[in-house]
UniProtKB/Swiss-Prot annotation:
The gene is RMD5. It comes from the Eukaryota. InterPro entries: CRA_dom, CTLH/CRA, CTLH_C, Fyv10_fam, LisH, Rmd5_dRing, ZF_RING_GID, Znf-RING_euk. This is Protein RMD5 homolog. Residues 112-144 form the LisH domain. Interacts with RANBPM. GO terms for cellular component: cytoplasm. Residues 150-207 form the CTLH domain. It comes from Arabidopsis thaliana (Mouse-ear cress). It is found in: Cytoplasm.
Length: 388
């Protein structure tokens, strides 16, 4: 769903409401001032029958000022603008928040219930919701998730890091040092750097230097600039916040280390850094508005049933983080490749989809045909399927 348009409509209503509130307060304040001014004059005027006409003139002046201010007219104008914005807002909600999303369902898709349950249980464990995960596994009758204990250990390390205790994280990183190097991760260096800064923060420069010699010097080949900054920061140890190295006080260093540890921990488990369930639901949420619009507008008029279609009836653009595989679109037919219509590399090196090659060779009745992008005569027997 397009939440931006909903937010924009809400912001317009909120702005009109604030303006209405501000204008109302302004008018009430002006009226109150005029009333207080008139009361002060009346209190100063002697109360006698001879001054009755003066009292009436004062009240007449107040009435004249009220007429000039025209509070009702001003309030009606702001209220009218607010009412117009409030009237439009529900229409935006009705347009964006489709109450019936069942039109986008594929009812004939078969799911392996066991796999779906395992994905859901794995999601709970990845989020650290171990009690909920255990309850879900028990109620569904599934066997315990094989990664549960590993995630328990991961969260034990993360909880220690929240307390600025780096020992569990360092122990894990050191024991998996070779694997982290293969993954080209600088996690171990980051953790040692944080420990170095914690020692230095305790005003113990000598201990920090000894720690750097023992644990950080080994990373000099790959992380020399970072090591130089760490060592120079010791010169500003007592006023690091006012130094060129104040970045070392940023909580972002710890947050980045936590994210990197989580990413690498999941990587060594053979898991993606993000939960498959989260990715699936988020990607589906992005594609849903496009599908609903297509179903409501196009499919309803054509009386087609997309339940029998092998591919999505419309292109659903997803954010870059959901693009995991290369996609080939045939330059001739403009169709996206599929299992039934894979990309084929011709002898000249150009690539077309299989169905396009079949059409150009008239379903194989011709042993060769001219490439549409170069003067080469393509031999059908030499066309090879590409795998991205």
């Amino acid at each position: 769903m397009e939440l931006k348009s909903i937010k924009d409509a809400f912001d317009r209503v909120a702005t009109k409401q604030k303006l209405s509130y501000s204008k109302t307060n302004e008018i009430v304040h002006m009226l109150s001032q005029e009333i207080d001014k008139a009361l002060s004059i009346l209190e100063e005027t002697p109360s006698s029958d001879t001054m009755l006409l003066d009292h009436r003139s004062i009240l007449a002046d107040v009435k004249k000022v009220f007429m000039e201010i025209a509070p009702i007219t001003q309030l009606e104008a702001t209220e009218k603008e607010l009412h117009a914005a409030l009237t439009k807002y529900p229409k935006v909600l009705e347009k964006q928040l489709n109450p019936d999303i069942s039109k986008a369902y594929r009812h004939n898709v078969e799911f392996d219930t066991h796999i779906v349950n395992q994905i859901i249980a794995n999601f709970f464990y990845r989020q650290g919701m171990f009690d909920i995960g255990d309850c879900f596994v028990a109620e569904t009758g599934e066997s315990e998730c094989s990664t549960r204990q590993s995630f328990v250990e991961m969260y034990r390390i993360l909880e220690a890091m929240k307390r600025r205790d780096l020992e569990p994280a360092l122990n894990w990183a050191v024991s998996n040092s070779d694997k982290l190097k293969e993954a080209r991760s600088d996690l171990e260096m980051k953790l040692h750097s944080l420990h170095f800064l914690e020692i230095a923060r305790g005003k113990n420069s000598k201990e920090a230097i000894d720690y750097a010699r023992k644990h950080i010097a080994t990373f000099a080949d790959s992380c020399l600039p970072e090591i130089q900054k760490l060592m120079c920061s010791l010169l500003w140890n007592r006023k690091l916040d006012k130094s060129p190295y104040s970045e070392f006080l940023s909580p972002a260093l710890w947050n980045n280390a936590v994210k990197e540890l989580t990413r690498q921990y999941c990587n060594l488990l053979g898991e993606s850094s993000e939960s498959p369930l989260s990715i699936t639901v988020t990607a589906g949420t992005q594609a849903l508005p496009v599908l609903l619009k297509y179903m409501n507008v196009v499919m309803a008029n054509k009386k087609l049933d997309w339940q029998t279609m092998e591919q999505l009836p419309v292109d659903a653009q997803l954010s870059e983080e959901f693009q995991f595989h290369s996609v080939f679109v045939c330059p001739v037919s403009k169709e996206q490749s599929s299992d039934d219509n894979p990309p084929m590399m011709m002898s000249c090196g150009h690539v077309l989809c299989k169905q396009t090659i079949n059409k150009m060779s008239k379903n194989g009745s011709k042993s060769s045909f001219k490439c549409p992008y170069c003067p080469t005569d393509v031999d059908i027997s030499r066309c090879r399927q590409l795998h991205f």
